[in-house]
Amino acid sequence: MILFTALLPPQDVVAALESELARQGVDPALRWSPPSNWHVTLGYYGDVPEIPELALSGRPAPSLRIEGAGTFPGVLWLNIAGEGLAELASAAGAGADGRKYRSHLTLARYAKEDPDAGKAWAERLMAFRTEPWVAREAVLMRSDRDERGTSYRVVERYPLNG
């Protein structure tokens, strides 16, 4: 089973983002993630046979906000900024593989051969900002793939202090 820990944006942040995307007009050239899949990954564990032991409950709750956008090859994302996020991600295992942690919310995917598709959208969304919110819990999520695409479901919840 493929597992990762994440923070889920609250409904008012989801609504603000949905409104912004509706205002911008969604580009069919991109494969947009449904709002039900929006999350901020903390730690990625990959295909593991059992649920890992995680010491996340009771950790300080980070204060977050969306500000700006960017791309990885084939991925359009929104930047997640805030106090306490890097520390929580580190506790969840981010960076254990030697890669630098980059807090983000994946919005869409596109053909890596067409980097301009993502770059244009990143520029359009660069000024998008949300009000800050406090993440009251981290979640362990399972990723499942079928003919309809990828879906995520919460396996465990870790309440945060704050």
Where do the model's predicted regions map?
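Histidine-dependent nucleotide/RNA phosphoesterase domain, centered on the 2H-phosphoesterase fold
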Residues: 1-162
